[in-house]
Amino acid sequence: MSCYFIAQICINDEAEYKKYLDKVDEVFEKFKGKYLAVDESPTVIEGEWKYGRMIIIQFPSEMEFKHWYESPEYKAILQHRLKAAKCDTILVKGLTKADF
């Protein structure tokens, strides 16, 4: 079952965040991640939205997500994102045909 990594991001240090961006795609593709949406200013329909940047990434399975997020390659660059930005992230499980 697919799963979706969703992040709200507020970048405080562009130079440090660039160090993350320069390498993240290379690591990301290795683990079968697929960008579904990246928006610098999503439209708020209801409630409050804390940060401007929104990212949705699909993985084929929760296992693939964990392999990516816990990989030494990702851990090596994650530090740059954590230093450069405030982030709220969640992992959402996708639906299967049985869910309908």
Which residues make up each language-model segment?
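Short S/T/G/P-rich N-terminal loop/turn motif that feeds into the first structured element of a domain
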Residues: 1-54, 59-70, 74, 93-100
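C-terminal structural segments of small proteins and small subunits
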Residues: 66, 73-90
